[in-house]
Design a protein with these regions (language model features):
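Extracellular/periplasmic carbohydrate-active domains that bind, remodel
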Residues: 2-492
């Protein structure tokens, strides 16, 4: 859990209007053109008595059509080409639901799910939520099931704590993430499921999380907050074409899952809302695709995890085979994409590409420390654009929160095989920070075609206990990243 914080209230309606109204998020082509023009203007302002080729790499990976690094298809969601048809389709109204925003529909949703579970092995089922405001506590999904929100449908999270029952802590965490013991269930929940779709016509799920945030701020929270959506020990999951607002805690949290697709999502929370990660797509999960999402939150936009200290190491369920692409967003206190800090089961084979992060604390961050154990390996980050990001690239220690006193300070993480290429950061505040661990240096870190603009001339990269190589970097990287000739760049 991050300690990211920033006080800024009343953001949601502004954000919703901006996303859903006439103002459109910029196309990738326009963003590409903007970065190219600004980069060229910056070049023209450089003192002409120096050779431009010595000062800054000319090939950003933005101008040409080819991309260094792994060549993968334009979509990683091929196994969900079409939402499956269901034999039984019912409306929440069929179970007594009233969409007036005031009447509790908790019993209606739970009755609906009990009914839908009958068709798990006989053609599946779909629950339609029509236009309206549907107040409800938590409810459990079933297998071979689709939750479909029509245009104008809004599911509202109950403000009654009793309608978010307590469930056991995850075994890879050993306790609730925020408090000892049990934790609150998520608003939309499932365990041991197969073939689950949560989709619609850009309907909305609003967790109404302010009640939960105030418990955290006031230090009166007794049990760990629930997520907006959590699926456990499940497979073949599609979350698609919806808006998620105001999660009490992490917004989307698949754990111990496989074959997960999260696409075309808008996820919003106030920038000061604590620990409202947008998507934690892989917590000890494998085969994950996240693409084409817009996120603004009070924590990481996307965070990859795999368990906490000795509990994660004991369970030893890694997160692997993960693709995150075409994610845009803002998090003034955290990172666009974070790996860790809970990564004790291991993280490997991650591709992150085509990210646009603005007005944020960090672009990409690897977070770990003594006690975590585990490993982070074979991470590829390619084609990333940033504006007004404080620290564009950050590998940092300082994950000094532990589940209990039994954590092992000798359990150090192993980090190696990190490839970062084709990165442009404008109006940066600080240079990259790369901090390994003395007894376990971060190895085989390679950076190519990385340009960080906006830094004062006296600002230098900060590196400690790392080793690797670099090619075409501006400004010059730290000496631990051995400089290679442009003609020997291994990614080319």
């Amino acid at each position: 859990m991050s300690t990211c914080r920033e006080s800024m209230e009343g953001q949601n309606q502004i954000l919703i209007n901006r996303i859903k109204g006439n103002l459109r998020r910029p196309s990738w082509a326009s963003v590409l053109l903007l970065f190219t023009v600004i980069a060229l203007i910056s070049l023209l302002q450089i003192n002409r008595e120096y050779s431009i080729s010595l000062l800054i790499p000319l090939d950003f990976g933005l101008i040409s059509g080819s991309r260094p690094g792994p060549q993968i298809s334009s979509s990683c969601s091929d196994f969900f080409k079409q939402v499956p048809a269901r034999k039984v389709v019912k409306s929440i109204r069929d179970f007594g639901g009233i969409g007036d925003g005031k009447t509790s529909n908790t019993k209606a949703f739970r009755r609906a799910m009990e009914f839908m579970a009958r068709f798990t092995d006989s053609g599946g089922s779909q629950l339609v939520v029509p236009k309206g405001r549907w107040l409800t506590g938590s409810f459990n999904l079933s297998s071979n099931f689709t939750l479909f929100l029509e245009q104008g449908a809004v599911i509202l999270g109950s403000q009654d704590l009793k309608e978010w029952p307590l469930i056991n802590a995850l075994p890879s965490y050993g306790r609730g993430r925020e408090r000892l013991g049990a934790r609150h269930i998520s608003l939309i929940h499932g365990n041991g499921l197969t073939n689950v779709v949560i989709t619609g016509e850009n309907g909305t799920v609003d967790g109404q999380g302010k009640m939960w945030w105030e418990l955290w701020w006031n230090r009166t929270l007794v049990h760990t907050r629930g997520h907006l959506v959590e699926l456990i020990n499940s497979q073949n999951i599609l979350i698609h074409n919806l808006t998620f607002l105001n999660s009490p805690f992490w917004t989307i949290h698949p754990v111990y899952c496989r074959n997960i697709v999260i696409r075309n999502m808008t996820i919003l929370a106030p920038w000061n809302a604590p620990n409202t990660d947008g998507i934690d797509p892989a917590d000890s999960s494998v085969n994950v695709c996240v693409e084409d999402c817009y996120i603004e939150s009070g924590d990481d936009l996307v965070a990859v995890k795999s368990g906490w200290d000795q509990y994660g190491m004991k369970m030893a369920r890694p997160s692997s085979n993960i693709i995150v692409r075409r994610v845009t967003g803002t998090t003034p206190t955290c990172s666009g994409v974070g790996i860790g800090s809970e990564m004790s089961g291991g993280v490997s084979n991650v591709i992150i590409e085509d990210l646009y992060v603005r007005d944020s604390a960090a672009g990409v961050r690897i977070k770990t420390d003594r006690g975590r154990g585990g490993y982070i390996t074979n991470i590829t980050i390619n084609n990333m654009k940033m504006e007004r990001v404080k620290v564009p690239i950050r590998f940092s220690r300082g994950a000094n929160d532990h589940p209990d006193e039994r954590w092992d300070p000798k359990a150090v993480p192993r980090v190696r095989g990190i490839r970062i290429s084709n990165v442009v950061s404008l109006e940066s505040k600080r240079p990259p920070l790369l901090e390994g661990i003395e007894e376990a240096p971060f190895l085989d870190i390679h950076m190519e075609n990385v340009s960080i603009f906006g830094l004062a001339p006296n600002m230098k990269w900060n590196c400690e206990y790392i080793s690797g190589s670099s090619c075409s970097i501006f400004p010059a990287p730290c000496s631990q990243l051995k400089n290679e000739s442009t003609f020997q760049c291994p990614i080319h």
